[in-house]
A protein has these predicted regions:
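Feature marks proteins synthesized as precursors that undergo proteolytic processing into two chains
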Residues: 1-210
Length: 210
């Protein structure tokens, strides 16, 4: 399955650089500690985790998924409520991201490992994809819906779909949020908006970035 370049590490680095008073290493210390020393899994998370495990054990048979089970279901099951879950590999990864301001993830050792595993398992993600990526600072787009300014991230994000759907719905009056007519109009707006986006906005965005 093709995957996109993960953007979170670069976002952590950018947010820390622009707004933080502490180093990224200091900010990520608690996450590293939880990963290394472990934390008790809550009942809600345990249930969600177990549901995912039950689904994955029946569907993810390929050898490429074995590391997932080795990491998140070491004893052949999802962690039980109150069980201490830890991952030294996660701790080391977070430390490398923090120490290099995320450069290790996109341009260094972690990027090499991602590339190697992707090639080994028939994936498409390459280190060149990682090297060519860094998060962007963008101006939000917005609409005014019944007196409220609703802001979203512009394309290539999907927030514009929600804004367009709200613009469609501005032309209608609603009295009961649970009535069939209200739900029907909301569903139709959410069906129409993506069709318009796919047919015009995405094509325009792609052309501008070729």
């Amino acid at each position: 399955i093709p995957v996109m370049v993960p953007g979170a590490p670069s976002a952590w680095a950018e947010l820390s650089e622009k707004f933080g008073r502490l180093t990224l290493e200091k900010v990520m210390e608690p996450a590293v500690t939880y990963a290394r020393e472990g934390y008790p899994v809550s009942p809600v998370i345990s249930k969600i985790w177990n549901n995912a495990y039950k689904e994955f054990i029946d569907t993810l048979k390929d050898e490429s998924f074995k590391p997932w089970f080795d990491t998140f279901a070491r004893d052949g099951h999802a962690p039980q409520p109150g069980e201490i879950w830890k991952s030294e590999a996660h701790a080391k990864t977070l430390e490398k991201i923090a120490k290099t301001h995320a450069k290790a993830f996109y341009q260094g050792e972690l990027g090499d490992q991602i590339d190697a595993y992707s090639r080994k398992t028939g994936g498409y993600l390459r280190k060149s994809d990682l090297e060519n990526y860094w998060c962007e600072w963008v101006k939000p787009i917005h609409v005014n819906y019944r007196g409220y300014d609703i802001c979203e991230i512009p394309p290539n994000g999907d927030g514009i779909i929600a804004l367009m759907a709200l613009n469609i719905l501005k032309g209608y009056s609603f009295t009961d949020r649970s009535c069939v007519d209200t739900v029907h109009k909301q569903l139709e707006a959410m069906k129409l908006a993506p069709a318009v986006i796919d047919g015009s906005v995405r094509m325009s965005f792609s052309a501008e970035n070729e």
